[in-house]
Amino acid sequence: MAQDVLTDLNKVRNIGIMAHIDAGKTTTTERILFYTGVNHKIGETHDGASTTDWMEQEKERGITITSAAVTCFWDKNQINIIDTPGHVDFTVEVERSLRVLDGAVAVFDGKEGVEPQSETVWRQADKYNVPRICFVNKMDKLGADFYFTVDTIISRLGAKPLVMQLPIGAENDFIGVVDLLEMRALVWPGDAKGDVTMGASYEVQEIPADLQAKAEEYRAQLVETVAEASEELMEKYLEGEELTLEEIKAGIRKMTINSELYPVFCGSAFKNRGVQPMLDAVVDFLPNPLDVPPMIGHDPRDEEKELTRKPSADEPFSALAFKIAAHPFFGQLTFVRVYSGHVEAGAQVVNSTKGKKERIGKLFQMHANKEMPVEGATAGHIYAAIGLKDTTTGDTLCDANNQIVLESMSFPEPVISVAIEPNTKGDQEKLSTAIQKLSAEDPTFQVSLNEDTGQTIIAGMGELHLDILVDRMRREFKVEANVGKPQVAYRETIKRAVERLDYTHKKQTGGSGQFAKIQIAIEPMDTASGELYAFENKVTGGRVPREYIPSVDAGIQDALNDGVLAGYPVVGIKATLIDGASHDVDSSEMAFKIAGRMAFKEAARKANPVLLEPLMDVEVRTPEEYMGDVIGDLNARRGQMQSMEDAAGVKVIRAHVPLSGMFGYIGDLRSKTQGRAVYSMTFNSYAEVPKAVADEIIQKTRGE
């Protein structure tokens, strides 16, 4: 069967399961694998036995950190699932999985509705135009409210949900759903009946009398919405004709793929209810690789020349590497999404991003951390490859005679860092190996050396992210080291333009000297596009020889690593080389690089330099009686209130708070609210640090 599917892309779905932490994504994935026959025993996250959570830390913490790719079959369709982490520190995993998916299932907690991380992941899916269906999970939970959750999809996500099912019962009495497409009830046998099928079988019944009117009302809304899918359907609807089941399904499919609406289903993955209809919906409504527009890229020799690749085995081979993972036996696994063409295991391809030849050793389709070897990789599928030496996340692999560079992924800058000091020389060597492997796997993990102290500084997306990286260094690479306290990753920028600064670098020490004269301008630059630095050359008449111009740029970039205020990296700068002069004998690339570095430092001091800090979106859910204490505490941490609202019996407070004020927050919040409040935090943006606070930080870093 697998071979037939490979040739028929209509029967393939590449999907992600995405949600807020603890909404039940991994449990939902486990149920899918159980019902599709991949697993014979259900793995529970809280037992540490889940298939997709296969790294030691994931099993211990009960959270998903790396996106495991799993292949399964449902109703003769192949579904490739990527289980993505919901914890904000691992947004990079979500980002890269969404980049290579065609559709997604957004899982919501039936009690909490849309939570902050659900919003973050939803926005990421919007960025990559990923069509979605919604699964309101945990309908068996105390306080679960399907209709409240649907309302939050409208109010918090600004999305258009299409209700496909209504829950029958709630909390402990949740037994099934009303299917609004076929106007019938699907009821799962309860535990009391001793359900030996683990929810694999359910009964089709009449709609309960108390839900009949509501079901008819929602069915009418569904049909009215679907009629908008095409003129033919609208005409038929307005003339009072019944739309057939096939017409309704086709209309929903079309509108879902265009992201005009999001079909909503409900269930309880933990109690084995509602998962199969959601799987049917994945096949019925989410796109196959042929429904997705052709991939756009550019010619590696000419960035202006746009190229496209259709999802067909007849097109030239192209694939995007979206994840690197270490494997206990094979070494490095590179996960790739093949967008066009076909490639055999053992073939030579080109990494067009880096301009290097690569050989694909072996190819696998993955089931979490079990591998199924395959002979070749075909358009529309996700594979793991071994043997790729130079390929990292975001690189394109392609046919040597038809090269293309596919659009890559953009990753956020780290916001937090710790110093790490190996205990012995042997540990230093192990640390180097660990850093090399971990940074290949994770683009948001950055490493630098503090030249003043000789310490290695590792930076990441949050305290949990760094905890897990350090934990992996100790466990997998046996590194023994002292780890410092977390530090905020501050940045520096300028507020004023300097229109002209002349700098001459001159050194005469017998024999040939060094000479470079340049005139530069610098100005602030908006970083919203993700671009942190730009360089322009306006020199005319060869006054600075062409071969020295990249050296000036390199010198300025060198200076950006180490700002003039407190030595933090500088962002949001446009530098222009206006004029200069050289000497036939004494000028060199090094002389112009030094001139670029020193000129920038001098100009930056005159450009009103300021310190920037990461500002976080913080959401706290607290019982009403603690609201005053929580708000007072956030204000004391320099927080700015954004909104307050009621949700599911608690107060939801949203604020912007500097990251520096959030260290140790969880302990303080617990003691202020007797452990009854919860919070979540996502990165918002970098913002200017108030002068009094900035002066304190600068004095501290200078050791004053």
Swiss-Prot record:
Compartments, as annotated in UniProt: Cytoplasm
Keywords: Cytoplasm, Elongation factor, GTP-binding, Nucleotide-binding, Protein biosynthesis
UniProt xrefs under CDD domains: EF-G (cd01886), EFG_III (cd16262), EFG_mtEFG1_IV (cd01434), EFG_mtEFG_C (cd03713), EFG_mtEFG_II (cd04088)
Main location per the UniProt record: cytoplasm
Matching Gene3D superfamilies: 3.30.230.10, 3.30.70.240, Elongation Factor G (Translational Gtpase), domain 3, P-loop containing nucleotide triphosphate hydrolases, Translation factors
SMART domains recorded: EFG_C, EFG_IV
Record-linked InterPro entries: EFG_II, EFG_III, EFG_III/V, EFG_IV, EFG_V, EFG_V-like, EFTu-like_2, G_TR_CS
Biological process annotations from GO: ribosome disassembly
SUPFAM superfamilies cross-referenced by the UniProt entry: EF-G C-terminal domain-like, P-loop containing nucleoside triphosphate hydrolases, Ribosomal protein S5 domain 2-like, Translation proteins
PROSITE patterns according to UniProt: G_TR_1, G_TR_2
Highest taxon in the source lineage: Bacteria
Disulfide topology: none
Record-level Gene Ontology MF annotations: GTP binding; GTPase activity; translation elongation factor activity
Keyword Cytoplasm: yes
Family of this protein: Belongs to the TRAFAC class translation factor GTPase superfamily. Classic translation factor GTPase family. EF-G/EF-2 subfamily.
NCBIfam families (UniProt xref): EF-G, PRK12740.1-5, small_GTP
Alphabetical list of HAMAP family matching this protein: EF_G_EF_2_B (MF_00054_B)
The protein's role, per its UniProt record: Catalyzes the GTP-dependent ribosomal translocation step during translation elongation. During this step, the ribosome changes from the pre-translocational (PRE) to the post-translocational (POST) state as the newly formed A-site-bound peptidyl-tRNA and P-site-bound deacylated tRNA move to the P and E sites, respectively. Catalyzes the coordinated movement of the two tRNA molecules, the mRNA and conformational changes in the ribosome.
Protein name: Elongation factor G
Source organism of the structure: Paenarthrobacter aurescens (strain TC1)
Upper classification of the organism: Bacteria, Bacillati, Actinomycetota, Actinomycetes, Micrococcales
Gene that encodes it: fusA
